[in-house]
Structures are given as structure tokens and as C-alpha cells.
From Swiss-Prot:
Phosphoenolpyruvate binds at K20, R119, Q163, R334, R375, K400. The gene is aroA. It is found in: Cytoplasm. It comes from Dehalococcoides mccartyi (strain CBDB1). SUPFAM superfamilies: EPT/RTPC-like. Disulfide bonds: none annotated. 3-phosphoshikimate binds at K20, S21, R25, S161, S162, Q163, S189, D303, Q326, K330. This is 3-phosphoshikimate 1-carboxyvinyltransferase. One of its GO terms (biological process) is aromatic amino acid family biosynthetic process.
Amino acid sequence: MKIHLDKSLPGGNIAVPSSKSYTIRGLIAAAQANGQSHIISPLIADDTLATRQVLSELGIDISTDAGSESWEITGNTFKAPSGNLFCRESAATLRFMSAVCARLPFECHLLAGHSLMRRPMLPLIQALHQLGIEIETRGNTTVINGQVITRSKVSLPGNISSQYVSALMLMAPACTHGLEIHLATPPASLPYLKMTKQTLGSFGIKVHSSIDWQEISIPPQPYLPARYRVEGDWSSASSFLALGAIAAPVFISNLDTDSFQADRIMIKFLAEMGAEIESGQNWVKVNPKPLSGINADLTHSIDLLPALAVAAACAKGQSILSGVRQARIKESNRIRAVSQGLSAMGINIIEEDDRLIIEGGQPKGAEIDSFGDHRIAMAFGILGSVVGETHISDAECVTKTYPDFWKNLESLGGKVTQDV
């Protein structure tokens, strides 16, 4: 699907969807608890539905509560699957479920979608090998011969993806002796490990971590059933926060300003650039002001790259976005996708190994390739609405995390049409 955006000045009120990261973590924790758990206000999108489907095919009963926005999970009823477990394009599903399947006493075949195949799994595979697990990749399939895990020490790099570490944390309580996880390098995206710890705590799991988070210890212990409420998604909000800074005031509800989510820092970056930020209990409002360039380290909030780059393109002066190397191994090579998109819109941009240098200016409409990446589509959807005459390819990719994105943009006054 291709989206065409005419020039407009979108602004107004929206509520962002629930957090993908918390929904997936909550689902996997609930699936390992004895008894019934409730996930309240889950995100319903491709990535979370992938996790739900994989768990269902492993014998976990998950139903939607009638008349309420919640899922009911009857946990710890795992059984051998009858076929492949399709993870769609969800890296969190593939990585987290690889670890969970490793401790189940049967063979599992986890099938990756097309773009997911290019995202690295080796550090997690090597970590599971250390624990005695037989796991290998065959084309787009990860084959795991699960077993009772009696080894308790594992080491892996922390600077490639926090998801490898979160995967081990989610499986650790069910290991015979728990797990002691050593990170050989400081962790990237540290807030995501804190989110995992918070979720585990909601299901009764005690986690011990060193100050620098390079040592994590989780004793063997049972998951307890819980009522687990999912907060709003700061990552999904980031493009609309940028919109408020470059176009017209945007009021966003369903955002916890005290959240552990890494991408909450977006409002700090926008404030440093000159935008006016207001916030209260469960809401944020961004008012446009003349923006200046920024030096921003995205090491722990890499998903902000597209949205912050769009704001930087409209700012006066130079912006340097650093700590972005790992953006190359997301749903697309986001450094290349952002660079190509902004260049097409007339913005001078220098692409380096771990930095993007953006000279702010006056972007103009262009043909934008989203590369099937939801965050690229959303960020350029915002910018395209402001400058007009913009076409975005593969725009349906937003269903990965934000199915109503284009509808929400229209509700704010964006002129969005689907090209036939």
C-alpha cells in the first residue's frame, strides 16, 4: 500500500496505543505462571499477536475477556507444538520465545518472517549453547531441542541487543538453579532491561542486578499469576511528539511520564531543541516553537532515530545523532533509510558508522521508501503531512506496532489518501 500526503497542519488530541514491549513481556511471564493472569489493555498489533499465537500453539490458553480490553491467560500448560511457530516479523517474539522454548522438554521450530531473517541471533544462540541447549538456525527457522536447564552461569555481550539479555531473564526463574548472567560489555538500551525486571516483579520474580547491570542474578522461583496493566507506548508516541514540535500543538494521552521506557527521553530532546513541553498525570502536550539543532546520544533509545531525525530536519542548524550503530540491524537499516529519505526531501545529511549529522532546512515532498519499516513510515508520515506532496511505500507496515497510525494522523487533520 502506498500513502499520499498533502500539505496540512495537523494538531489536536490523540491517545497512543499500549506498549508493545510491556505487552510481550507480560504475555510471556503470564504464560509461565501457574493459574490465571489478566493482561489489561494489551497492544493488539502484529508483533504482540505473533507472541500470542506462538504461546497458543505451545498449549497456553489465551482468551479475550468479554466486554473488556484484557486477555485472560491460563499459564504453565505447555505442550509440544504440532508445527512451526511463526514469529512474523517480531524480533522480540523470536528471541524471547527461543529462550522459553529452550527450557521446555521438546523440540520447537521458530519460523522468522522475511525481514526478521536478517536480524542477528548468534549472541543468544551462543548463550543458550553455554547452558547446554541444542539450538541452530536452518534458513529462516530456529530449531531448539529444549530440556531441563541445570547449568546456571552464562556470559554474553551486552552492547548488541538488550533483547538477548531480556530473553535469558524471562527463562531464568524456571531453570533448576536460576541464572547468573554476566554481560561482557556494558548493556545497550539499558531501560529495556529495567522494563523486563519490572515485569518480572509484577509476576512475583525477584531479580538482583549490579549497579552497572553487567551482573544479573535470578534465583529459581515460580511465576505468580497477576493482573498486569499495560501502559502507553512512548516509542509509538515519538512521531506525534515530533509533530507537535514542528507543526501544531499535539496533546497525547495514555503516556506515563514516570515510565521506565527508554523513549520517554524524546520530550527531553524536543525541549532542548526549543519545543514547549507540558505534562501531567498520563498526558503530554507539545507546542511548536522555533527549533535548534541538538547533539543527542541515542545509545539507550535507538528507536527514536527516525522521529528525532525528522524534527532535526526542521530545526535551525546542525544536529548530531550519535549512538545509532545498532539501528542498522532493525526492521531496516534505519541509518540508511533515514539518510535516503531526508536526502530525497532536500536535507543535507552525513551518514557515519555511529552517527547521523543533519543540517536542518526546509524539507520538501518526495517519494519515500519505508523499506517495510514501521518507524520509518510513521516518522516520514509526520514530515510528509507538514510539507505535502509526499508518497510513502509499504505504508501498511505500521500494523506491526500501531495499526491505527494513519487513522490517527487523519483525525489530527492530516490529509492522508491511499494511492490505488
